[in-house]
């Protein structure tokens, strides 16, 4: 539980250590990140997107209707959509003001990658770029999306549950590809075990915040770091 609490406090304090005066708080309204060679955005606008050819141009258009078209393409055929694509969609959604959608697609991408990396042996050189890119997205985009997500703890829990259910309901087909070595003799069973662990972690979070003291302490920590002022609408 100590480790879990530490992770939550990191989410409360994320992105608060930039050089700012104590009196002036910068509102974080965009996810300005660079993850070569997949994605770059500055001041809320994409500089380039190279994650999934069917939607790259739509994401570059930088408007809500185009983003929704991109999401529809993913929803219609999600089986081989890479986690980096889902987290890029999350970044675009955040920049365009669809922040709850951003939370969902970020967690969906994060959990899809976790499921992949838990079943497939990603320690080899062939996965170096994949691991680095996903780690970068989870860290850089997460430093913005997580603090926003916890503006409403109850809503965050609902979205996390939906994201886990989405990953369970849409197994990433790459997990079952013979091209990729697995640490498990039964990949379906291994994937099921990963999903069960994600659900168990989700339940631990619910139990943690069901304790009024834990919730109050967490809210106080966010207030200390002025996280709500930076991230909440």
Describe the residue ranges of each PLM region.
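Hydrophobic h-region of N-terminal signal peptides that target proteins for export
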Residues: 10-19
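TPR/TPR-like (Sel1-like) alpha-helical repeat modules
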Residues: 99-115
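Sec-dependent signal peptide recognition
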Residues: 2-10
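N-terminal alpha-helical interaction modules that lie
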Residues: 21-80, 112, 130-233
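Hydrophobic/aromatic side-chain positions at a characteristic register within alpha-helices
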Residues: 59, 94-95
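Acidic, Ser/Thr-rich low-complexity linear motifs
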Residues: 119-130
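Conserved small-residue packing positions in alpha-helical repeats and bundles
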Residues: 55, 89-91
């Amino acid at each position: 539980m100590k480790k879990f609490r530490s992770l939550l406090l990191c989410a409360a304090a994320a992105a608060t250590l930039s050089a700012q005066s104590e009196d002036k708080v910068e509102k974080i309204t965009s996810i300005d990140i660079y993850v070569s060679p997949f994605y770059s955005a500055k001041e809320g606008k994409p500089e380039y997107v190279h994650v999934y050819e069917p939607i790259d141009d739509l994401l570059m258009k930088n408007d809500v209707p185009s983003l929704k078209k991109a999401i529809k393409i993913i929803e219609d055929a999600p089986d081989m959509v890479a986690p980096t694509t889902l987290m890029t969609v999350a970044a675009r959604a955040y920049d365009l003001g669809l922040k709850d959608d951003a939370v969902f697609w970020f967690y969906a991408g994060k959990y899809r990658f976790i499921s992949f990396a838990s079943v497939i042996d990603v320690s080899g050189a062939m996965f170096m770029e994949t691991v680095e890119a996903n780690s970068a997205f989870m860290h850089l985009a997460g430093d913005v999306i997580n603090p926003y997500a916890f503006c409403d703890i109850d809503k965050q829990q609902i979205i996390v549950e939906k994201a886990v259910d989405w990953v369970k309901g849409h197994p990433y087909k790459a997990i079952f590809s013979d091209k990729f070595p697995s640490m498990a003799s039964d990949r379906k069973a291994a994937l099921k075990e990963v999903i069960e662990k994600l659900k168990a972690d989700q339940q631990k979070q619910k139990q943690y915040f069901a304790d009024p003291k834990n919730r109050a302490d967490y809210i106080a920590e966010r207030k200390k770091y002025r996280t709500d002022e930076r991230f909440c609408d």
